[in-house]
Amino acid sequence: MTRGKLITFEGPDGAGKTTVLERLVPLLQAALGQTIVTTREPGGVAIAEKIRQLILDVSHTTMDDKTELLLYIAARRQHLVEKIMPALESGHLVLVDRFIDSSVAYQGAGRGLDKQAIQWLNHFATDGVDPDLTLYFDVPSELGLARIAQNTEREINRLDLEQLDLHQRVRKGYLELALENPQRIVKIDASQDLESVVSAALAAIITHSQA
């Protein structure tokens, strides 16, 4: 059986990638005619969801940056083994809300941790599994945070409470990743209206599937 494809959705907080992912599922099923598995990080499976609660709890204000990184990576490992790899081995298209690039952008560019160490730890945890395609939803930090503040249905987490400068560093980190990985990462202007963003994301995935 042909291995499935892994497509990751990345972006700073408030970029709208989660909403776009949800909107894409029926469109992709109609266009590609294959089983689609959607999941998220941190989380996706029971153990990783418990780790997610630890990481994002607003009361955990004293969490060390390296502790945060290692918790994300632990959740990623369990998620990969328990959900992502079985789906890929079954030939499914797997759409993941955040993956390795989030660690590089948030804990690397955002927190200032060593990027080479982050990449090595992720390589170790994932056995070298990389996305086939990454959609990066770019939005100015001010707009992203304004969207979060206006979204009454969103549960505020610990990272949402960080200062603007951290979110700006995260965005810069993502933009650097996009420049360094032009064959894998497709940058999408997420400041557009939702329909335009969904259309751009759909076109990128279909183009990749036909390559």
UniProtKB/Swiss-Prot annotation:
Catalytic activity, EC: 2.7.4.9
UniProt keywords, alphabetically: ATP-binding, Kinase, Nucleotide biosynthesis, Nucleotide-binding, Transferase
CDD domains given in the database record: TMPK
Catalytic reactions of this protein: dTMP + ATP = dTDP + ADP
Any one biological process term the GO annotation gives: dTTP biosynthetic process
Classification via Pfam families: Thymidylate_kin
Enzyme class: transferase
Single GO molecular function: dTMP kinase activity
TM stretches of this protein: none
Gene Ontology CC, one term: cytosol
InterPro entries linked: P-loop_NTPase (IPR027417), Thymidylate_kin-like_dom (IPR039430), Thymidylate_kin_CS (IPR018095), Thymidylate_kinase (IPR018094)
Function noted in UniProt: Phosphorylation of dTMP to form dTDP in both de novo and salvage pathways of dTTP synthesis.
Family: Belongs to the thymidylate kinase family.
Protein name: Thymidylate kinase
Species: Streptococcus equi subsp. equi (strain 4047)
